[in-house]
């Protein structure tokens, strides 16, 4: 029976299994599967767009012994920032690679409701503890 099912279905099932320890909210998983993955906010000052990974392309990573998921492929003007999911507190964090600054950003629902505000606030240092 398995041989008759589409391979993508099993790849997705395998990805879900791999990401189980990250405790991703269902809404976040669904968003990364359906998009839009390119977020645009032309009225913002610093960052006018960002591109998220699709669910199948989300990157597992470790930073200072913390297991995290990288959710953002790239964003406008700033290549040294990563948008990360932390399973520990079930929140988005960001990492400024150049300055080695790691700060909490928002819960997924808050972020996706106004991503331009959060990404620009991140650049301006609004969320630094």
Language model: regions and residue ranges:
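Short acidic-glycine loop/turn motifs at beta-strand connectors
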Residues: 86-89
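A surface-exposed partner-binding patch
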Residues: 1-83, 126-127
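Compact, glycine/acidic-enriched structural inserts
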Residues: 93-126
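Substrate-binding/catalytic groove segments of enzymes
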Residues: 79-81, 91-94
